[in-house]
From Swiss-Prot:
Its EC number is 2.4.1.-. This is UDP-glycosyltransferase 2. Gene3D superfamilies: Glycogen Phosphorylase B. GO terms for molecular function: hexosyltransferase activity; UDP-glycosyltransferase activity. Belongs to the UDP-glycosyltransferase family. It catalyses: exophillate + UDP-alpha-D-galactose = phaeomoniecin D + UDP + H(+). Phaeomoniecin D was found to show anti-HIV activity, antibacterial activity against methicillin-resistant Staphylococcus aureus (MRSA), alpha-glucosidase inhibitory activity, as well as significant protein tyrosine phosphatase 1B (PTP1B) inhibitory activity and thus is a promising candidate for drug discovery projects. CDD domains: GT1_Gtf-like (cd03784).
């Protein structure tokens, strides 16, 4: 008997934080165009955002259904802890707390799909662990395939890299590997409390053998781990798992392009009669403009360049900065789609949002980076390692630091040349096609296995 070639139902599962939901929304819209039926599982606050794109919505249960629009409210201890291991430990603990509700939510959608006689492939983002218990042996409905889409730097332990969060470059020399092994073991020792919490939680769900690290298991557990970057942006690992694939960056579909009109001064951007520098602090760490936006505007005010700053959460500088005098060479907007803005940029100054860095390099634009919250320490370290960026390696930059780095990048062609090399590598990838191909491969393999069992 020949295995069925019908397309599987695709369940998209995202933690309810914008950058996570937005990426899977792009994927979901593309899959619907390709003829897949989809269900989108995330927090209630994103129902309208998901349904506006024409995607069927299913709400997460219990504490997994939080309001990720306010990160500080969702994770109240985050801002009270210093960047680095304390914050990562707190975040790990919070993610583990949500796993039972995530697991229950995924099982509910799988039950709904199975009741219709359909097979499902589950796609989840890096921070969502709802399908992992099943992959680890917990009882319940097993999907035809599982895919995790990597939207952060890879959190893998490796003999060739220092532990995630250290910000150190890779080193595969004998001395470097000795450093890496020692540092990795130290981090595992520090994470013993959260690891014990992870182990207890997984066993409560019926998992018999629990992996020895939560973040590592995020990569190694699914059938496929599809990393949203090019291979040249991620550290090389001689011991990388076989399920890992690099698929390039996502291009936004029509449904995902911003509805914000372009500003009245957009002609000045298109005119491009002088170097254009873009500065932004992204969608999460954008509550203190003194971290990067203000130092950048101060640093560049006397240079013969044009600066565009996007504030994301407001239309103008507010709070204790509302009296700040905007320099004459600065144009301010709440939001401009980076896919449009970066076409005209010569340099991007940013705090290191993973998607923003991918978009900049995908357009061949070099960067100056400063940020140490969330995963930004690792993102910025990789960007500098790639050769297309300068990493200031701080949370709050000074005007002098920014000016020196901006002038260096604009005056030294090696940064632009390297960014253009990365652009070519991004252009050779088709992330959405790769995702569809992996869905089909997993569904076909599952169907063939089922046929063999029935013979």
């Amino acid at each position: 008997m020949i295995a069925s070639t019908a397309k599987p139902h695709v369940i998209l599962a995202a933690v309810p934080i914008y950058g996570h939901v937005e990426k899977l929304r792009i994927i979901g819209c593309d899959l619907q165009k390709r003829g897949y039926a989809v269900t989108f599982l995330t927090g209630t606050v994103w129902r309208e955002f998901v349904e506006h794109a024409g995607l069927p919505f299913f709400a997460l249960k219990a504490n997994a259904d939080f309001d990720g629009r306010d990160f500080a409210k969702a994770f109240p201890m985050w801002d009270k802890l210093p960047p680095g291991p304390p914050r990562f430990g707190y975040l790990r603990h919070s993610l583990i707390d949500q796993m039972p509700a995530q697991h229950e939510s995924v099982q509910a959608v799988l039950e709904d799909v199975a009741a219709r006689g359909l097979k499902a492939v589950v796609i989840q983002d890096t921070a969502f662990f709802g399908v992992n218990p099943i992959q680890m042996g917990a009882p319940g409905i097993t999907p035809a395939g599982t895919i995790t889409v990597g939207i952060t730097p890879l959190p893998l332990f490796s003999i060739d890299t220092a532990p995630f969060g250290s910000g150190l470059p890779p080193d595969s020399s004998p001395e470097g590997r000795a450093r890496n092994i020692a540092a990795n073991e130290k981090i595992k020792a520090v994470a013993q409390i959260s690891q014990a919490h992870f182990t207890q939680t997984m066993k409560s769900l019926g998992v018999k053998t629990v992996p020895d690290d939560l973040l590592n298991s995020a990569v190694t557990t699914p059938d496929r781990f599809l990393q949203l970057c090019i291979e040249s942006f991620e550290y090389p690992r001689s011991d990388a798992p076989s399920n890992l694939r690099y698929i390039g960056a996502l291009a936004p579909g029509d449904e995902n392009k911003s509805q914000h009109p372009l500003p009245d001064w957009w002609d000045l951007v298109i005119k491009h009669d002088k170097p254009l520098v873009v500065v932004s602090q992204g969608t999460l760490s954008n509550h203190n403009y003194k971290d990067l936006i203000i130092p950048t505007l101060e640093a560049l005010k006397d240079l013969d360049i044009r600066v565009v700053t996007t504030l994301v959460r407001t239309d103008s500088l507010d709070g204790d900065l509302q009296d700040f005098q905007i320099p004459s060479n600065v144009l301010v907007a709440k939001f401009i789609p980076f896919e449009e803005l970066f076409k005209h940029a010569d340099l991007v100054v940013n705090n290191g949002g993973y998607g923003t860095v991918q978009t900049a390099f995908g357009h061949g634009v070099p960067m100056v980076l400063a940020g140490q919250t969330e995963d930004k320490t690792e993102t910025n370290a990789r960007a500098a390692w790639s050769g297309a960026a300068i990493n200031l390696a701080c949370q709050t930059a000074t005007a002098e630091q920014v000016r020196d780095a901006v002038e260096k990048v604009l005056n030294d062609p090696k940064y632009k040349n390297r960014a253009m090399e990365l652009k070519k590598e991004y252009e050779a990838c088709d992330a959405l096609q790769s995702i569809a191909d992996n869905i089909d491969e997993l569904a076909a393999a599952a169907a063939a296995e089922e046929e063999d069992e029935n013979e």
